[in-house]
Curated annotation (Swiss-Prot):
Species of the source: Escherichia coli O6:H1 (strain CFT073 / ATCC 700928 / UPEC)
Residues bound to L-tyrosine: 37, 175, 179
Gene name in the database record: tyrS
GO MF, one example: RNA binding
Motif ('KMSKS' region): 235-239
Gene3D superfamilies noted in UniProt: HUPs (3.40.50.620), RNA-binding S4 domain (3.10.290.10), Tyrosyl-Transfer RNA Synthetase (1.10.240.10)
UniProt protein name: Tyrosine--tRNA ligase
Residues modified to N6-acetyllysine: 144
Main location: cytoplasm
Subunit structure: Homodimer.
Motif ('HIGH' region): 42-51
PANTHER family per record: TYROSINE--TRNA LIGASE, MITOCHONDRIAL, TYROSYL-TRNA SYNTHETASE
Function: Catalyzes the attachment of tyrosine to tRNA(Tyr) in a two-step reaction: tyrosine is first activated by ATP to form Tyr-AMP and then transferred to the acceptor end of tRNA(Tyr).
S4 RNA-binding domain boundaries: 357-414
Ranges in a coiled coil: none
Length: 424
């Protein structure tokens, strides 16, 4: 991605919601590499899909020769950002936040190159400058530059002030000052001149721009990426089970891959622009090919492959594809013990059972059948498989060889209804 027209290229991909002084920023980028940053607050023990677009934007800038700073908010995570939140966040302990900081720093690291010369990425933590700051310094050196009149008129805060059931605490109201000071600090330490973030961060970003100008007399810029929406109006990045996380222990690579496979045709080509590094020409060619093929579109598989590889690496992608193929074909011989652990985590419904159970009881306990009577009929009708093998004996008791790796048995009713037994 060439640096001189980087903003235009991001706009072509639909990746720019708002930008401050676009012309001046384009000029600054044309002069040579800049340092830029994006902040990630540790509000949970993992990043989720909502963080992926700004994180990949940092990567896009680095690929164009710029220096990314990934800021993990060890201090701001203790306070909580009120922007567009309906209610006050629960405050977490310092120990919890520190634990989450470490996890998020490790999650961010694989997306950026920390050893590539001049534009090597930097990992920063705002606890480094806020941890020992006293309240008088905060109020005198930072607070005096902020107008409360302007702060209460910011859209992100106004919504909370206008709610009768939920006001805003001074703690959360102060968040804007903390994030603003982050920008000024990073400008002084690393020469950072651009902050990127989600569109909900616009108010915090512009505060940082104003504060940096007042404290250091430097012109800096802000760019927000859009809130990702789905064509049908439902929320992006959520499943029935909740958020889709980047941590494989919270959302398995298989489940992650399946999330992208299930992308609607109306969204898939847009998402390829947001979440992959394919060129616009490649994406348009794929769309044209899908339109004219007369078959099921290929785009969902391309999207799932590209994003799963980005987040979980080649091994994670291959495991996800292997599990998908085995569930489709019914042959489980290629699955490893780790693959079954992914299925047990969130891949298919799971039930724990004591050894000595019979098949009818397993079908009832797994909710594949409502009663033993119904289970008997279903088994007799040849509609049940155990580890991919048909079983038509209603009196069947599980054998040791049915317990793969001594732990797992996969039941299937019909073509698509699965349950994994984890033996105690």
């Amino acid at each position: 991605m060439a640096s001189s027209n980087l903003i235009k290229q991001l706009q072509e991909r639909g990746l720019v919601a708002q930008v401050t002084d676009e012309e001046a920023l384009a000029e600054r980028l044309a002069q040579g590499p800049i340092a830029l940053y994006c902040g990630f607050d540790p509000t949970a023990d993992s990043l989720h899909l909502g963080h992926l677009v700004p994180l990949l934007c940092l990567k896009r800038f680095q690929q164009a020769g710029h220096k990314p700073v990934a800021l993990v908010g060890g201090a701001t995570g203790l306070i909580g950002d009120p922007s567009f939140k309906a209610a006050e966040r629960k405050l977490n302990t310092e120990e919890t936040v520190q634990e989450w900081v470490d996890k998020i720093r490790k999650q961010v690291a694989p997306f950026l190159d920390f050893d590539c010369g001049e534009n090597s990425a930097i990992a920063a933590n705002n606890y480094d400058w806020f941890g020992n700051m006293n309240v008088l310094t905060f109020l005198r050196d930072i607070g005096k530059h902020f107008s409360v009149n302007q702060m209460i008129n910011k859209e992100a805060v106004k919504q909370r002030l206008n709610r009768e059931d939920q006001g805003i605490s001074f703690t959360e109201f102060s968040y804007n000052l903390l994030q603003g000071y982050d920008f000024a600090c990073l400008n002084k330490q690393y020469g950072v001149v651009l902050q990127i973030g989600g569109s909900d961060q616009w108010g915090n970003i512009t505060s940082g721009i104003d504060l940096t100008r007042r404290l250091h007399q430097n012109q800096v810029f802000g760019l927000t990426v859009p809130l990702i929406t789905k064509a049908d109006g439902t929320k992006f990045g959520k499943t029935e089970g909740g958020a889709v996380w980047l941590d494989p222990k919270k959302t398995s690579p298989y489940k992650f891959y399946q999330f992208w496979i299930n992308t609607a045709d109306a969204d898939v080509y847009r998402f390829l622009k947001f979440f992959t590094f394919m060129s616009i020409e490649e994406i348009n060619a794929l769309e044209e090919e899908d339109k004219n093929s007369g078959k099921a579109p290929r785009a969902q598989y391309v999207l799932a492959e590209q994003v799963t590889r980005l987040v979980h690496g080649e091994d994670g992608l291959q495991a996800a594809k292997r599990i998908t193929e085995c569930l489709f074909s019914g042959s489980l011989s290629a699955l490893s013990e780790a693959d079954f652990e992914q299925l047990a985590q969130d891949g298919v419904p799971m039930v724990e059972m004591e050894k000595g159970a019979d098949l009818m009881q397993a079908l009832v306990d797994s909710e594949l059948q409502p009663s033993r009577g119904q289970a008997r009929k279903t088994i007799a009708s040849n509609a049940i498989t155990i580890n991919g093998e048909k079983q038509s004996d209603p009196e069947y008791f599980f054998k040791e060889e049915d317990r793969l790796f001594g732990r797992f048995t996969l039941l299937r009713r019909g073509k698509k209804n699965y349950c994994l037994i984890c033996w105690k």
